[in-house]
């Protein structure tokens, strides 16, 4: 329940989400006193939703300035660690965090691992367009991306879009400074070669930023 604005934002947002989505149950991980204080500001909502959320008290939280390595070694009682751990224990189906991104990635890899053939996770965002949407990744989980990593990102994104949108073979493209095959740098060329040869990827080629929309 951390992030830039903390429970003052996440609690009311969660309660509104519960109100609008009747099939959802939410587990809150964080400081019990702070969470309950915010919940009491919304008595009408809380009264109707009391059976659809649960609060788990956590003794610590991961700060926004904390190094991921420190979080891995010292923050096993933090709200972030316990929330991710609940996925590993199959208590919850998804985890939403507004906290330290580096720590989130490190703890997720430690607790959940990666799917077969994938070495690193990526941050993905949905971008609306005139007809449908585009998913863009990686958006900050990795500073430097090799051709192999970019190929893995394409595999992850393709699989995710297939599951979320029920599309058998979603199209995949690599964002570049031009659509020509000789544009960009060596790692982009390597990624393009791997994606083109992969039967699990419906690879279209290079695209420019304007094509995202």
Write out the residue ranges for each language-model feature:
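Short glycine-rich anion-binding loops that position phosphate/pyrophosphate groups of nucleotides
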Residues: 1-2, 60-61, 100-102, 110, ...
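Short glycine/serine/threonine-rich phosphate/pyrophosphate-binding segments
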Residues: 4-11, 35, 76-90, 94-108, ...
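Short coil/turn connectors at secondary-structure junctions
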Residues: 21-24, 50-51, 89-93, 100-101, ...
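Short beta-strand segments
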Residues: 29, 54-56, 97-99, 126-127, ...
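Phosphate/nucleotide-donor binding subsite
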Residues: 44-92
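Short, acidic/small-residue loops that bind anionic groups at enzyme active sites
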Residues: 94, 105-140, 197-207
């Amino acid at each position: 329940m951390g992030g830039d604005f903390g429970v003052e934002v996440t609690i009311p947002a969660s309660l509104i989400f519960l109100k609008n989505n009747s099939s959802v149950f939410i587990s809150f991980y964080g400081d019990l006193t702070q969470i309950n204080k915010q919940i009491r500001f919304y008595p009408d909502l809380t009264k109707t939703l009391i059976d659809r959320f649960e609060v788990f008290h956590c003794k610590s939280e991961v700060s926004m300035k904390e190094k991921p390595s420190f979080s891995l070694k010292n923050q096993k009682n933090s709200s972030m660690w316990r929330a991710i751990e609940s996925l590993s224990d199959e208590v919850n189906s998804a985890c939403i965090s507004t906290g330290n991104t580096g720590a989130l990635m490190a703890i997720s890899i430690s607790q959940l691992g990666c799917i077969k053939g994938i070495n690193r996770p990526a941050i993905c965002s949905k971008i609306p367009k005139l007809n449908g949407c585009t998913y863009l990744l990686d958006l900050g989980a990795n500073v430097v991306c090799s051709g192999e990593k970019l190929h893995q990102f394409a595999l992850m994104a393709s699989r995710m879009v297939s599951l979320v949108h029920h599309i058998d073979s979603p199209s995949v493209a690599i964002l570049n400074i031009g659509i020509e095959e000789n544009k960009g740098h060596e790692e982009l060329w390597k990624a393009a070669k791997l994606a083109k040869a992969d039967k699990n990827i419906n690879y279209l080629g290079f695209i420019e930023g304007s094509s995202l929309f």
